[in-house]
Amino acid sequence: MNISAYILLGVVVFLILKLLLPNASKRFLKLQASLPTSKIRSIAKGLAKVEGKLLMKNPLFSPIKMTPCIGYYYLIEKIDRDKEGHNSYSTIHEETQCNPFEIEDTTGKIEVVPEGIQLFLMENTHQYTSGEKRYSESLLREGDEVLLIGYADAKGGVPFLRKDDKYKLLGITLVSSINLWNKYQPLLRSFLFTCVIIVSLIIFILLQ
């Protein structure tokens, strides 16, 4: 087998693993497509998906702009530049911080205990570059329309949402972001599948 075939085989293996291996993001995206949306007033105990508007209780202040927010994802990356001047980025530091908050829909509101929360498909709210580092933050703010998946529990007869122990998940995203994902995800999956087929055919030809 020549070196080109080895490289292409590695690409195929990478694409297959990327498609098949489970992670928190894939669990969240799969569950948001299969779970029905619960109304807050009638939410049942167990894994639940809710949609609504964020209500802030005690604000956090974001690392870059000191913007009052409910929560944030903060990322610091090292910038590497190749001989052609193209940049690549590697993570130096990342963190998610979130204070307790509420979600409100047309039927009521419910508190969210944010321990272990993960933010998915979030656009950068602020980003800048300094020297060989890039700094980015994505914010959850008062009034944002969101989709959240977590475990609906109750204490003293009062329902709340927390991280689900079985799926190891308390995930949140903007409704606008998940709508875009659901619209274009089938096209992305078809593209990746087509890439795997094409590369596999090239490897087969190189082996002849």
Task: Locate the predicted segments by residue.
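OB-fold and OB-like single-stranded nucleic-acid-recognition modules
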Residues: 2-208
